[in-house]
């Protein structure tokens, strides 16, 4: 006989991606058709990305990878692409590891699919496919944690 105590969730995978889906998708070419006459290459495309995680159930979360991209040619808006790409994930890890896994690892797994959707979307919209370089979700997470800590410190200083 063994005296070993089973760890809860030890027989389960630490991370399960239950599904991925497009929650919201929008593409606009507000200056069409004139903008295509000015098209002589890839537009300037600043990319805004946000990652959020929302609990759905116990150890069950929706992770959202949101992109907002506004392509410009000679200062004019060529296109606006918005994508809210989500995954439903089950996380079987100790509580202190859940937040980083949801905001670093899950988006890292989702990113290639979202990038492909955006490349197809811009191509089908009449532009060159937008090839987004891999994102550093760990750096994004660190920046978010530092910003939250700075805000908390500022609030504490103001309260005293």
Curated annotation (Swiss-Prot):
It is found in: Cytoplasm. The keyword Cytoplasm applies. One of its GO terms (biological process) is protein transport. Keywords: Chaperone, Cytoplasm, Protein transport, Translocation, Transport. Signal peptide: none annotated. It comes from the Bacteria. Belongs to the SecB family. This is Protein-export protein SecB. The gene is secB.
